Regions:
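Metal-dependent phosphoesterase signature
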Residues: 68-87
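N-terminal accessory regions of nucleic-acid-interacting proteins
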Residues: 1-20
Length: 202
């Protein structure tokens, strides 16, 4: 039986599933301030794909990154540039709140990819501010809520333990094939939410 604490977070996740929120995942050249998005996927709560594309970065993908996400420089050689991809993503973000697993990372990478690729270069300051606000104020961290629901406490951090997406998916019987590719990760997030929100068996 769920605790009262778990019931609250289950209700939050159930509300997401019944909303027009979308789920976003990005794959990147790395984690640093100079890194860029090389793949982005957006799906809705029915699992329908709204956007799913590789992105050609302005610099090569490091080999150690390819080992994680299996995205090679050859795969992105003919992919569209971020400046061509982002307007479609922004149109969706302006209309919908969006979830991601550690959403602050995806939000940061969207903004810094705009900076790295020159997307902001010819825009007036108020438009740049509007875009950044649309990204930064409309995201929801699905991982943080799941962490609270799962309830594994980290005594060292004095907080709930951070749950890895693939681990959470496997825990709930969600296929993890293709992990660290954007579409697979989006579908894992959706699958985890659906499994958490299944009615309890008496």
């Amino acid at each position: 039986m769920l605790t009262y604490h778990q019931s609250i977070f289950k209700m939050i996740m159930a509300n997401w599933l019944n909303s027009d929120h979308v789920i976003i995942d990005t794959e990147t050249t790395g984690l640093m301030a100079s890194d860029e998005i090389i793949e982005i996927t957006i799906i809705n709560m029915r699992g329908e794909i709204l956007l799913n594309t590789l992105v050609k970065p302005s610099r090569p993908i490091p080999p150690e990154v390819t080992k994680i996400n299996n995205i090679t420089n050859e795969m992105v050689a003919d992919a569209p540039a971020w400046c061509d991809v982002f307007p479609a993503a922004l149109k969706i973000i302006r209309k919908h709140k969006w979830l991601a697993w550690n959403s602050s990372f995806d939000a940061r990478l969207m903004v810094q990819t705009c900076l790295q690729t020159g997307f902001f270069d010819d825009l007036k300051p108020h438009l740049i501010t509007s875009i950044i606000m649309a990204i930064e104020t409309r995201h929801i961290d699905a991982k943080a809520v799941y962490d609270q629901w799962y309830g594994e406490f980290d005594e060292k951090r004095k907080n709930f333990k951070r749950q890895i997406l693939a681990t959470a998916a496997a825990r709930h019987g969600i296929p993890t094939a293709g992990a660290h590719r954007a579409l697979a990760d989006c579908l894992m997030i959706l699958g985890v939410l659906k499994q958490v929100c299944q009615p309890e068996v008496a």
